[in-house]
Amino acid sequence: MNKASEAEAVLPELLRFADGTAVAAPAAWPRRRKEIADLIVDIEYGGLPPTPAETTLETLHLSSVRGLEGVRFLSGRVQTGPDRPFAFLLTLLLPPGDGPFPVVLTGDACWRYVTDAVAADVLGRGFILAQFNRTEIAPDVYSDARSSGIYRVYPEGAYGALSAWAWGYHRCLDALVGQPFVDASRIAVTGHSRGGKTVLLAGATDERIALTAANNSGAGGAGCFRRQGPQSETLGDLMRNLAYWFGPKLRAYVGREAELPFDQ
């Protein structure tokens, strides 16, 4: 890396407010945290969809699971409302016993549900495995990006698909935390690639999430926009091919990544 590149790769100072003053004590961190979050949510993601007044979980089906003694399968409907209602499916595999159990939640069921081996491992550790299809919340198709899902319910705003999918995780949290079999203090979220980008946003904007486990989230996730290794995903790549994941303001920083007031 040459000297010019080194200068451009300097990351924004985490413990300094936008006005230049230092975060001098732990008590000041929540204010700085909110400052960073507000910038990122606005510039990178185009905001977040509105939070509904209420969210419920309706049980559609509950049964035992053949070959897994004591394990139960619950298929439920997450329903928001009362104004501008929206619903999507959430499935749970519950370990033996009454709980309350910790939860591993993933929205990557759009690709495929987890394998039997992974499910058995999660259940064997005494965790609930919760899964939903994030493309029920917003489509993952460039040419049809705002035609269905919550875009029909909340057409206002400039939020991209990542914000919509993160909203889905938040509504699952709403539905789960009041259940007697759920340990609301131990809920983890996980996702891969674009799902990893999604859970990083979901975890950063909902402190009920105890653990965020993102896998291969790339640029716009755990990877930097400023610092790039060989064949890294870049902001330019994202804007050329997948701009609908993000808010419209981010495009202005292609080739000007060093001017972003944050990096991730």
Map each language-model feature to its residues.
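N-terminal targeting or regulatory segments adjacent to alpha/beta-hydrolase or S9 domains
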Residues: M1-F88
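Proline/glycine-enriched tight loop/beta-turn segments at coil->beta junctions
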Residues: D83-F88, L94-V103
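Cap/lid segment of the alpha/beta-hydrolase catalytic domain
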Residues: G99-G178, C224-R227
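Generic beta-strand/beta-sheet core signal
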Residues: F132, T190-H192, T212-S217
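Alpha/beta-hydrolase fold nucleophile elbow
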Residues: F181-S193
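Glycine-rich nucleophile elbow surrounding the catalytic serine of serine-hydrolase chemistry
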Residues: G191-A202
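Conserved hydrolase catalytic core segment
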Residues: A204-A210
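Mobile cap/lid helix-loop segments that gate and shape the active-site cleft of serine hydrolases
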Residues: A214-Q264
